[in-house]
Amino acid sequence: MNKYSAFIVCISLVLLFTKKDVGSHNVDSRIYGFQQSSGICHIYNGTICRDVLSNAHVFVSPNLTMNDLEERLKAAYGVIKESKDMNANCRMYALPSLCFSSMPICRTPERTNLLYFANVATNAKQLKNVSIRRKRTKSKDIKNISIFKKKSTIYEDVFSTDISSKYPPTRESENLKRICREECELLENELCQKEYAIAKRHPVIGMVGVEDCQKLPQHKDCLSLGITIEVDKTENCYWEDGSTYRGVANVSASGKPCLRWSWLMKEISDFPELIGQNYCRNPGSVENSPWCFVDSSRERIIELCDIPKCADKIWIAIVGTTAAIILIFIIIFAIILFKRRTIMHYGMRNIHNINTPSADKNIYGNSQLNNAQDAGRGNLGNLSDHVALNSKLIERNTLLRINHFTLQDVEFLEELGEGAFGKVYKGQLLQPNKTTITVAIKALKENASVKTQQDFKREIELISDLKHQNIVCILGVVLNKEPYCMLFEYMANGDLHEFLISNSPTEGKSLSQLEFLQIALQISEGMQYLSAHHYVHRDLAARNCLVNEGLVVKISDFGLSRDIYSSDYYRVQSKSLLPVRWMPSESILYGKFTTESDVWSFGVVLWEIYSYGMQPYYGFSNQEVINLIRSRQLLSAPENCPTAVYSLMIECWHEQSVKRPTFTDISNRLKTWHEGHFKASNPEM
């Protein structure tokens, strides 16, 4: 038994006798702080924190028990497991954070318990003016403690200035190992900013006690949550697009210092490689190389960093190494050839008088071998031709379900616009039954690259699978002769954007609420079909919806980029043109296109419908629009737009993509509203 253990036993005996005497006079023992005779540092034997606190001495406040804390932790962890607001990268730190916050580890458990009992004794000693009898009793207690002090060999260890100055003891007053302050601040301010704020306010999690990072001491001997900042100081170049770059470059190509990522990116928890730093990175492969945010004339913009590509740096080394290897092989080959010639020359001197039989004059030219090789090449060529033929047959089989026409069956009437593949025309199609119908013709431009031709055929394969009354369906193709064409049903009233403008109050016309809902419902049902087939549109807008007679609306993607729509697209950091006014922040910043981003776009289309085709964020430049979307400056309600419809728009523009409604939910709501308006407009039905 060490000296601290012996002292605890002795102190406990003194307190026991003191408590007995005092208790006989009906004095509440809680005044003396005797609730917990086992001290405040306990060996953890629970289940919730077993993985991080097993067999550790943990601090338990005198007014609580280990069972109390265990029950609170169970309840709090149950809330966390069921929470849908918890990011996956944040969830892994939730339990260690709760365990370390509620039960920090005692650095010196025996000494901490010793000081606790000494404080209890000192606290009992200081009670005065209870009664004369009590004073006599207290004098006896003080005498007992004084005798013990004199006999104790470790008196200076206990009854000295080292005794904790506060009673009851707290996490701040004791010698405890707590969460590392730097990791706590990263958790609270960057990686789990939203989750940490919710936890602090939550009634169940708050009962456990979440650490206030500002009050944590700066101490190297602390409890680590395992949060690591991914940095490799030796990495001075990047591979591919730089999404795996972890170097320490923190200056843009123009020489401006990079800003800390957490200052500008709200969803930093999706990219844990960005926490606690301002180094150049390429999260989500947004750019072609590492980049960062910089300050530029009152606004923060994206700039690429001046970091070399690893392939460029090692190119010379590769060429040099390859040249050296080739040179070595040449030298070895020359040596072998020289030795063989020497041997042959020596052998020929011995047999030069022997008469050789007559032979084919081509035997030294290996004519037969050459012929065999030629035959082999021929067979190999036939094999490659066979593989290519099979590939074409497979491609042809995928196109068999589409009607095929010749250019003689198609008559081009007028140009409608121009897209990525080429021009789009209005025309006439002669069908097998000798009747003609009006069609929209999407023609592949002349001298298109191999990749463009492949993309064109790939689009045919994709579109051929789409069959819905609110999707513009392909009628057939022309693939036997250039120009290759896709043939679509022709929509008489043009695109929805033009239709809305031509029926707006500025043209002396208007649409009813029933017509607005009819348009919106058809688009939502078309998108519901696409999303059910895991198809992401990426460019849903009024300009890409077509209107036929009878107010039939169908979704298309003809890629019409006429001059009147050029302002709807914006080139972000030298990438392809993007319709930023219809895109959520995750698509603009990270190039993340999903069904949820299509839902955002549908909300903007709904806004276009009720504003009669007005351009979203009219009057702002595209860069200003990006800043507005990132700062959650949403479009205001159009004039005469029903509150319920605008509320649906707001839901579609939820910052967290998972909280946006599905197209099924949207269609159900619009259908209910449409039926209500229809019944109100036709009471006799």
Swiss-Prot record:
Q: Which UniProt keywords apply?
A: ATP-binding, Developmental protein, Disulfide bond, Glycoprotein, Kinase, Kringle, Membrane, Nucleotide-binding, Phosphoprotein, Receptor, Signal, Transferase, Transmembrane, Transmembrane helix, Tyrosine-protein kinase
Q: Which residues bind ATP?
A: 416-424, 442
Enumerate the Extracellular topological stretches.
Answer: 25-317
Which residues are annotated as modified residue Phosphoserine in the UniProt record? 131
Which molecular-function annotation in GO is an example for this chain? Answer: ATP binding
Residues in FZ domain copies: 36-225
Q: How does it sit in the membrane?
A: Single-pass type I membrane protein
Q: Which residues lie on this side of the membrane: Cytoplasmic?
A: 339-685
Q: Where in the cell is it found?
A: Membrane
Residue stretches spanning the membrane? 318-338
Q: Which cysteines are joined by disulfide bonds?
A: 41-106, 49-99, 90-192, 180-222, 184-213, 237-310, 258-292, 280-305
Q: PROSITE patterns per the record?
A: FZ, KRINGLE_1, KRINGLE_2, PROTEIN_KINASE_ATP, PROTEIN_KINASE_DOM, PROTEIN_KINASE_TYR, RECEPTOR_TYR_KIN_II
Give the tissue specificity. Expressed in neurons of the developing nervous system.
The record's comment on protein family reads: Belongs to the protein kinase superfamily. Tyr protein kinase family. ROR subfamily.
Tell me what this protein is called.
Tyrosine-protein kinase transmembrane receptor Ror
Q: Which gene encodes it?
A: Ror
